[in-house]
């Protein structure tokens, strides 16, 4: 199973991908985490990426494509049943390169209104031990009910005892810049895959991670439909 998740920064696609990857034994290719690991290692790639992130811009197409291609090759040597792409493709050029690289079974566009996204992004945190993503925001507005996502004592690395770190690029000015860039890039991408009649499904969130069962039903229904063909 080869899945691509779309969604603006902070929508929660990484969390959904992580849960789905474990449930279905799929490799979670999280481009953002890969880049952050390179920064942490202070590699040449990491230094290049860090300069771009600090300015609030996006990393070059060629670098992203090479990273994704290498990750896909590594999957062939492991016992995964497929992969979930999270954070790729980011523009039309990357979309067309993806189609050349492999066949995708399902695209899912996870979305939230912009004002809710900003609140979520301002509350985003990273564990300084296990590097997992969490969120301290408690959003109770209109039909949205999204409590905080905090570390669990069941984590084998941090046991829930950790200092949560705020990303340097999670301030309101950079957040708005990134959302503007995302909307500019992704509206054409999503329309492209819809027009080309790929399997693309829109999935609106209301309760955050508690919407996962409905999200998972998309995959279940896809499999049922494929068996009927």
Swiss-Prot record:
Q: Which GO terms describe its molecular function?
A: adenylate kinase activity; ATP binding; nucleoside triphosphate adenylate kinase activity
| Activity versus pH, per record | Optimum pH is 6.
According to UniProt, the reaction catalysed is: a ribonucleoside 5'-triphosphate + AMP = a ribonucleoside 5'-diphosphate + ADP; GTP + AMP = GDP + ADP
Q: Which superkingdom, per the lineage?
A: Eukaryota
Region annotation NMP: residue ranges? 30-59
The UniProt comment on domains reads: There is a putative zinc finger domain which may bind to iron.
What is the purpose of this protein?
A: Catalyzes the reversible transfer of the terminal phosphate group between GTP and AMP. Has very low activity with UTP, ITP, CTP and IMP and no activity with ATP, GMP, CMP and UMP in vitro.
What family is this? Belongs to the adenylate kinase family.
Q: What is this protein called?
A: GTP:AMP phosphotransferase
- From what organism does this protein derive? Plasmodium falciparum (isolate 3D7)
Name of the gene encoding the protein in the UniProt record:
GAK
